[in-house]
Amino acid sequence: MPITIDDTGQTVTLNPPYSPVTPDDSLQKITRVYFAKKTVTQQGANVAFTRIDSLHAQQEGGQNTPFDSVLGKTVYLVIETENMATLSIDAVIRPSDNTLTGNTETLSLMWFNPETQNFEVRRKMTVVVGNFDALNNKGTTENPSGTHDHYTNLADHENKAIIKLQLRPSLRTDFNTWATNIAAAATHTANLEVVVERTDNEPCAYGPDSTEEVKEAGIFLNSDAQGRFRVGNRNFYEIYARVQSGTTYTDGTYNFLPMNGTVRRKISKLENPSSTQVTYYHYDIYGNEIFIATCNKTSVMGRNNGQQLGAVPQGALRTENAPAGGAAQTNHIFANAIVTTGTHRNDRNARAFPGALRIVRYTASGTNVPLVRMPDTLNVAVNGRVIAYGFSNTQRRFCNPDCFAAFVGVLSQYGLAGVNSTGMCFGDATSYPSLAHPNGDSVDTSYLANRQNEQNLLNAFVDWNFAQVIAGTTQQAWLRNAHRYATDHNDHLHSGDFDGNSIHNIYQ
């Protein structure tokens, strides 16, 4: 039965008569409606849209994902038209079945208001064909709404209506319910469809092959032939590139995150209680989304900073082999602690147990902490630069999820290959031989041969809110801006105590 969009944004059935209108030579038509990512090329001059649906599969690591977008992500809704320049269109989004909410009523989602540059809850979204305000960059004092004038190919999109939105409700409780329902579905996805109609309720044709105008709404993304739009569950982080100007860095013009005091936040996150996977997305200086990695997340008992011991205490419940490939050898498991022995020998001038093989006790903190298993290597090209690292002589390849997001930001700002990490923490949150790495909130990196490169890397760690950067006192004494210098860091840079409060939590 034909439908229309009412004033509240709900879709309702039309009463007869609803006969077709005889078209003239200027058939007014909505040809296609689809969700998309923004794709910017030519050093920020050209903008295009990349469709995301079941007919245009998304990939991670060369493999198709079972979904087209993630619950909570920012996407664009693109409405392609013919002979409808400057006309206004209403659009609503609703579930294709009962999976997401238990019904198929129109969803209230977070619509991007170009004037305020904030996301606002909206059921019915109204947009004008040929208006590009959804593409605006971050506003300035002189121009609070931003601008899209830097795009030189907007004429290519003059017959499109463009909406920017986040695929989430305004309330955390509703988000959790939707996530639970998606997790319970056989496909672990929920399908969304779009209903569109002229705001003035005048006749319109729908679909690329339509030859008649009808006075009703059109439905898109509601069949396999059109493509389904499938939403899945993930925790995710969005990491925004900074713009280099000489030796300094400023916020990118497409970073819309809120301020943290006088500094704009550079990372946002959305935690999804129905997923144990965390996906990291980088946004370059033009606003392009770049997939970095998906990591498995666990929750383990947190550990206090390690304490050196002269011997392993009696009374261990059991012993276990430590992960091979690093200095740790044996874990001695106690009721409220893990004592690790290994091959690391203290310096002869160390204050505690000089020259001895190190024995470290990590007591339980009493609170679980989240950890992600980092990729063994990373090498992602971004505009002639790279986000890259490898590990060296360590199996400490687990990290606090927030800290890993910040590390990706550091690498994006540094922009060169050759960064080797000597580790974060193990999967049990201990960090042998380090005393100060439990819970994966610190990053160790080998010193780079090039002095300027090492200084740039250190500066990036400081810029990305690592509050305890420690450099050595011998060959590295020339490094500037470290928070502390210590002899036990003569062979590696320690970047720790990442400030998680610097991250924008979408539901806080």
Where do the model's predicted regions map?
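Active-site acidic/histidine clusters and adjacent loop/turn architecture
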Residues: S274, A293, S299-N420, F426
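Catalytic cores and adjacent binding grooves of peptidoglycan-active enzymes
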Residues: Y240-N272, T276-T279, Y283-N288, G315, ...
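Contiguous beta-strand segments within globular domains
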Residues: N64-E80, S88-D90
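Short, compositionally biased P/S/T/A/G/V-rich stretches that sit at domain boundaries
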Residues: I3-S69, N235-A241
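Short aromatic-acidic-glycine turn motif
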Residues: P95-F119
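Short beta-strand elements
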Residues: D7-Q28, D200-S245
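Short, surface-exposed glycine/acidic/tryptophan-bearing loops
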Residues: G427-A449
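Short, aromatic- and glycine-rich surface loops/edge beta-strands on solvent-exposed regions
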Residues: M1-I3, D7, P16, N137-K138, ...
